[in-house]
């Protein structure tokens, strides 16, 4: 069975060098929800962290029908801190919530804050507020979040370090400011009238515009109206579409994630209106907010690949890749590990079996992954990455384009950690080392000891891994909010289940306690993972996990049947098939047609025909 829960304490290690990386002195406040909250509680406790507390939103499922919710049961009452919600609905509420989190941390003696993969986790203002309050964020610093997390800044950095990027415009607001005033002197004068200044000596006109805009954000002043930027968006979109006949474009907010803040448009679409929609969706309409949006070529038939990065500010290391192309409504559903060792072994096996074409395709895939990993490491070092982040790319054939960096832990981080171990070795005595097999764990280590941690080696763990997101959805994979889980079978051998603690039994009776899904934030219920000696084995194991999972309840609808069918499609076709991000939609259409055809079949007649078949 994959080693997930185990003793991670370093305080009692025989080596003084290893002991120096002990984390038991940390005091951590967890400010997120979902499976990552329970995972973080477990990992930090396994690391020996003496004090772990959590926020609890009023929107969370606080009570079972007949018992306390698992998050509440596993935490001492004095370490549960109620809040109205985790982020606030407006900028003012967000500022209020951040101040509340800082106050809770100071009042209760927390030194570190962990935000999982919620919106707060890559909010530079939130991280900066923690830093100013003397708290340590378990994640990238505000400097890194700004440099890597803002999609426009990240794209400029990518170009500087020879990373492939999609064609388009990354400086919409700079262009709008110059178009409004027509000269550097005009921009400087207009900004000065609003109390904004910046050093623009020797800067070209768009660079000068960007410097003035950055100064305006710091001052909380708008140099442009939303209407002015929207008009510039329409101008840029029209120009790009004229140069790219027949193509579509993607408007993408510089912040956001999970598909939020993005719109695809074609010739004739109202780019200005779509721009306004995006700003509203990512809550960037306030005075002083950075309202820049990327305008990029939309690569239609794409795969979505990403690289797991870890860094300490000096070095950056890749833990391998993930294929996240199997998605719907911009939400990932099934994530697959893609690593150089696995692809190399798979290519050799196919060649030995006489399948030269697939062997060559797998070798090409391996080369592609190697390029993405190298680019990810260069990018991480360029921005001084000092925690965990994900380098995301779109893949078109054997080419890839940098898409964005998520400066946080991802939902699917376990897909990578199940395939790799980070081995930290004493540079003065190579025989002394310690291993880390958890992204959450290494984030804690980096927050406590980052500059001292030597660049780790990558040691093999499992050759392949898969993650299925078990969501509360209807048959179209649209969210099905609410519902109650009354029974859930125990995990089978080798199954890794991150279920928010839902399956924790009643400590007195050992019985399953019915759980009411809140449905206030997203539809995810749990993450189901498996590993294998190769991709085929990991798919076969996941198929067995799904087959044996018994999940019942009232008004409960999940995508477990979808996953069971999808996994068997790959097992019956080829586990190394490379679906695009459009695959799931087409798959659902074909499944619906098959279901309608099956309704017309007389099962008794079909069974008799099978018995008579030679």
Where are these regions (language model features)?
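Short glycine-centered, acidic/aromatic-flanked micro-motifs in structured strand/loop junctions
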Residues: 115-117, 253, 530
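ATP-dependent carboxylate activation and anion-phosphoryl transfer catalytic cores
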Residues: 1-38, 42-46, 82, 92, ...
């Amino acid at each position: 069975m994959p080693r997930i829960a185990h003793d991670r304490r370093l305080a009692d290690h025989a080596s003084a060098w290893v002991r120096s990386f002990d984390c038991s002195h940390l005091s951590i406040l967890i400010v997120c929800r979902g499976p990552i909250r329970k995972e973080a509680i477990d990992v930090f406790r396994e690391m020996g962290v003496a004090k772990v507390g959590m926020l609890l939103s009023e929107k969370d499922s606080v009570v079972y029908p007949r018992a306390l919710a698992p998050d509440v049961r596993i935490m001492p009452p004095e370490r549960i801190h109620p809040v109205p919600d985790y982020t606030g609905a407006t900028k003012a509420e967000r500022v209020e919530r951040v101040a509340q989190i800082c106050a809770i941390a100071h009042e209760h003696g927390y030194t570190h804050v962990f935000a999982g993969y919620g919106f707060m986790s890559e909010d530079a203002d939130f991280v900066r507020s923690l830093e100013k309050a003397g708290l340590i964020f378990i994640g990238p610093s505000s400097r890194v979040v700004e440099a890597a997390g803002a999609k426009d800044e990240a794209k400029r950095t990518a170009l500087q370090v020879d990373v492939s990027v999609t064609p388009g415009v990354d400086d919409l607001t700079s262009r709008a400011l110059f178009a409004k005033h027509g000269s550097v002197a005009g921009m400087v004068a207009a900004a000065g009238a609003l109390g904004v200044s910046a050093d623009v000596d020797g800067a070209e006109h768009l660079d000068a515009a960007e410097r003035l805009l950055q100064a305006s954000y710091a001052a909380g002043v708008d140099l442009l109206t939303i209407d002015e930027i929207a008009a510039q968006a329409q101008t840029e979109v029209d120009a790009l579409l004229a140069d790219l006949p027949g193509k579509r474009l993607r408007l993408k907010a510089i912040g956001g994630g999970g598909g939020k803040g993005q719109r695809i448009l074609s010739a004739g679409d109202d780019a200005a209106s779509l721009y306004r929609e995006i700003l509203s969706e990512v809550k960037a309409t306030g005075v002083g907010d950075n309202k820049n949006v990327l305008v990029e070529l939309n690569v239609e038939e794409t795969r979505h690949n990403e690289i797991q990065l870890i860094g300490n500010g000096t070095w950056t290391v890749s833990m391998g890749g993930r294929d996240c192309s199997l998605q719907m409504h911009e939400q990932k559903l099934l994530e697959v590990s893609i690593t150089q060792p696995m692809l190399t072994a798979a290519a050799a096996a196919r060649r030995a079996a006489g399948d030269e074409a697939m062997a060559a395709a797998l070798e090409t895939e391996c080369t592609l992954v190697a390029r993405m990993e190298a680019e990810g490491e260069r990018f991480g070092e360029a921005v001084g990455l000092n925690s965990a982040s994900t380098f995301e790319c779109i893949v078109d054939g054997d080419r890839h384009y940098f898409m964005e960096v998520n400066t946080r832990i991802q939902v699917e981080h376990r897909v990578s950690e199940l395939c790799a171990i980070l081995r930290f070795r004493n540079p003065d005595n190579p025989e002394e080392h310690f291993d880390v097999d958890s992204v959450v764990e290494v984030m804690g280590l980096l927050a406590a000891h980052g500059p001292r941690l030597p660049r780790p080696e990558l040691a093999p763990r499992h050759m392949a891994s898969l993650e299925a997101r078990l969501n509360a959805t209807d048959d179209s994979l649209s969210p099905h909010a609410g519902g109650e889980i009354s029974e859930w079978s125990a995990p089978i051998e080798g199954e890794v289940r991150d279920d928010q603690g839902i399956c924790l039994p009643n400590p007195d009776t050992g019985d399953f306690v019915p759980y009411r899904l809140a449905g206030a934030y997203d539809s995810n219920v749990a993450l189901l993972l498996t590993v294998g000696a190769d991709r085929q084995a990991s798919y076969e194991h996941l198929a067995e996990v799904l087959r044996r999972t018994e999940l019942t309840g009232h008004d409960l609808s999940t995508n477990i049947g979808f996953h069971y069918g999808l996994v068997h499609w790959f097992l019956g076709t080829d586990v190394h098939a490379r679906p695009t991000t459009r695959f799931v939609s087409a798959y659902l259409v074909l499944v619906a047609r098959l279901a309608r055809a099956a309704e017309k079949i007389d099962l008794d007649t079909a069974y008799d025909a099978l018995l008579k078949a030679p």
